[in-house]
């Protein structure tokens, strides 16, 4: 009987240990490789109030989009991975109502709208809301 109790307690202890290890690992994001470059704010921080420009040259901050779910994507015409992901982001935006979910494609090209807008037209990127951050103030905030 003592052996059975010992085995039961051992199995229960092992199960609890596994639960703690797996549970705590699931709570942590995978920050290995290139993902380690990301900074996680816990608790989440408000978006910076840094001004950027619309393609029409109007100043705007991220606060203008506070009632929406917003994905902010920094990109440049010279960034190969950025160029590759733009069509996917464009299709993703097309699948959602911009009043609820908005993808902000923030160009960090030094050429501003003169560089970004023709590039987007050439590649058929029609659904993304494009902002300009040629001095990388928002990108580095």
PLM segments and residue spans:
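Thiol/disulfide oxidoreductase modules built on the thioredoxin-like
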Residues: 118-127, 132-141
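Short helix-capping segments at alpha-helix termini
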Residues: 95-100, 123-127
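A short beta-strand-turn-helix
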Residues: 42-45, 49-70, 93-96, 140
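N-terminal targeting signals for export/organelle localization
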Residues: 1-49
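Conserved redox-active cysteine motifs that mediate thiol-disulfide chemistry
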Residues: 66, 74-94
């Amino acid at each position: 009987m003592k052996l059975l109790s010992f085995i039961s307690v051992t199995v229960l202890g092992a199960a609890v240990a596994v639960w703690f290890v797996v549970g705590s690992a699931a709570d942590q994001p995978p920050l290995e490789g290139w993902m380690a470059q990301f900074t996680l704010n816990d608790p989440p921080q408000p978006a910076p109030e840094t001004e950027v420009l619309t393609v029409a040259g109007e100043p705007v901050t991220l606060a203008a989009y506070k009632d929406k779910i917003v994905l902010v994507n920094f990109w440049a015409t010279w960034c190969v991975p950025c160029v590759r992901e733009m069509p996917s982001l464009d299709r993703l935006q097309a699948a959602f109502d911009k009043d609820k979910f908005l993808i902000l494609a923030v160009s960090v090209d030094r050429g501003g709208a003169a560089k970004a807008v023709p590039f987007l037209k050439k590649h058929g990127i029609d659904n993304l809301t494009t902002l300009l951050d040629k001095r990388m103030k928002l990108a580095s905030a």
